[in-house]
């Protein structure tokens, strides 16, 4: 090749359209640019260039290379000669660029909805007034509701006592069974496992390709500790954990102070929160998102007392009927029964003093277990009683008479319950040990 030919090749005005286009197929003896699969012209002279280099003609075996443009020159000339090299990308056969999603996408995904999710039920065994469940259904294509029977909650404590007695355990089993039925009635279901949540949830998230776990926060030391373990485990898998608050009458985010500044005295707490607005209850969804199609997750059986290592105990009353039946349906039935009782008292115009204790004893004994399990929410209780009493109150009802007796007692009980849950949250969430003064106690507060 003489110098005139070189200058002609370097001058863009003397080049053909194919020569000026770096993506075009060359029909000259110059080096060829390849688009993943090497393309050959019909020129026999050009084919001779590869006669001594058969190992350079390869068919790519990686599908990803077909989607990435690579231009590289193969020249028989010495390095001192002119060569044409791509400035677009390296040869994918030498450094393949693979674009793999961080997590497999659910096959039923739609563009408007972003992911599959796990809803971790804890002490919120209900479908009504459940922000966690509703949010997951609003934001996700598919939802996997899960409940874990944590083996650490059963057996003997270090003091030799049962961590969970047979009556409470049976009540919990019934509550979980009722939750499963309520989810099934809405097109969903409940996956049940016996195991540590931080292990079970990660495994399930992998199986269904979940990008998020939805759960309500709790307040005790062990529960907060479990939340930390789950966040750590999920972070390693690239799964987001979204927590909600739904166990108190007043919402944690609505408090006029930070949780670490919570007063240790009930009176000071009451003065600061009693004028706050109580958030409205959240209606139960009539239809829930279906379970993820990916993973083919087994639902699992609800364990018996023996499965949990607990000896069954006769739990019938003198009439031969179960003393208490767990579940959301029973909780709502008892709430309506108590509201009807309050309404009956109002209609009779019972204005005798000192009746608050009667309301409290009746209500506290009949609703506390369901409230503790989360089969019913404090806000639902407040709304139902307020609605009933408002409908029964007339212009002739004295201001401080029975028209607000039941509601006043309910507020009194729920405020105490809020105080104890927030004070527990304050110290269980503290990163460093805090010297705590004694909190005022009240025997009438709910569990």
Swiss-Prot record:
GO MF assignments: photoreceptor activity
Region (Disordered): 1-20
BP GO annotations: nucleobase-containing compound metabolic process
Boundaries of every Photolyase/cryptochrome alpha/beta domain copy: 115-249
Compositional bias ranges of the Polar residues kind: 1-14
Cofactor section: FAD
SUPFAM superfamilies named in the record: Cryptochrome/photolyase FAD-binding domain, Cryptochrome/photolyase, N-terminal domain
Keywords: Chromophore, FAD, Flavoprotein, Photoreceptor protein, Receptor, Sensory transduction
Keyword ATP-binding in record: no
Domain of life: Eukaryota
S-S bridge residues: none
Keyword Cell membrane: no
Cofactor-binding details, from the entry: Binds 1 FAD per subunit.
Record-stated family: Belongs to the DNA photolyase class-1 family.
Protein known as: Blue-light photoreceptor PHR2
């Amino acid at each position: 090749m003489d110098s005139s030919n070189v200058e002609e090749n370097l001058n863009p005005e003397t080049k053909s359209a194919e020569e000026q286009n770096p993506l075009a197929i060359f029909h000259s003896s110059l080096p060829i640019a390849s688009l993943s699969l090497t393309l050959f012209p019909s020129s026999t002279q050009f084919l001779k260039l590869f006669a001594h280099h058969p190992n350079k003609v390869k068919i790519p075996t990686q599908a990803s290379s077909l989607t990435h443009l690579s231009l590289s020159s193969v020249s028989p000339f010495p390095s001192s000669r002119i060569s044409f090299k791509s400035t677009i990308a390296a040869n994918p056969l030498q450094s393949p660029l693979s674009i793999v999603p961080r997590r497999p996408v659910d096959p039923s995904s739609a563009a408007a909805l972003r992911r599959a999710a796990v809803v971790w039920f804890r002490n919120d065994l209900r479908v009504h007034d459940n922000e966690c469940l509703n949010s997951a259904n609003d934001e996700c294509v598919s939802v996997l509701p899960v409940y874990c029977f944590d083996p650490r909650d059963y057996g003997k404590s270090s003091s030799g006592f049962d961590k969970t007695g047979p009556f409470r355990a049976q009540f919990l089993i019934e509550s979980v069974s009722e939750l499963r039925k309520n989810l099934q009635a809405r097109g969903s279901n409940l996956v049940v496992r016996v195991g540590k949540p931080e292990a079970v949830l990660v495994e399930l998230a992998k199986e269904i390709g979940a990008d998020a776990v939805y759960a309500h926060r709790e307040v005790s030391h062990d529960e907060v500790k479990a939340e930390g373990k789950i966040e750590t485990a999920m972070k390693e898998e690239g799964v987001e954990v979204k927590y909600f608050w739904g166990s108190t009458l007043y919402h944690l985010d609505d408090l006029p102070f930070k949780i670490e500044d919570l007063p240790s005295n009930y009176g000071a707490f009451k003065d600061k929160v009693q004028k706050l607005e109580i958030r409205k209850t959240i209606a139960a969804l009539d239809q829930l998102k279906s379970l993820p199609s990916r993973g083919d997750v087994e639902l699992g059986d609800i364990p018996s007392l023996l499965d949990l290592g607990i000896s069954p105990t006769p739990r019938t009353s003198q009439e031969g009927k179960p003393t208490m039946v767990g579940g959301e349906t029973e909780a709502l039935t008892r709430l309506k029964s108590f509201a009807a009782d309050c309404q009956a008292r109002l209609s009779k115009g019972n204005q005798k003093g000192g009746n608050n204790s009667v309301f409290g004893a009746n209500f506290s004994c009949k609703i506390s277990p369901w409230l503790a399990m989360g089969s019913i929410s404090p806000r639902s209780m407040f709304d139902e009683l307020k609605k009933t009493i408002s409908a029964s109150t007339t212009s002739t009802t004295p201001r401080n008479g029975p028209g607000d007796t039941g509601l006043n007692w309910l507020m009194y009980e729920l405020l105490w319950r809020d105080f104890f849950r927030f004070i527990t949250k304050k110290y269980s969430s503290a990163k460093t040990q805090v010297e705590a003064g004694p909190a005022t106690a009240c025997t009438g507060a709910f569990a």
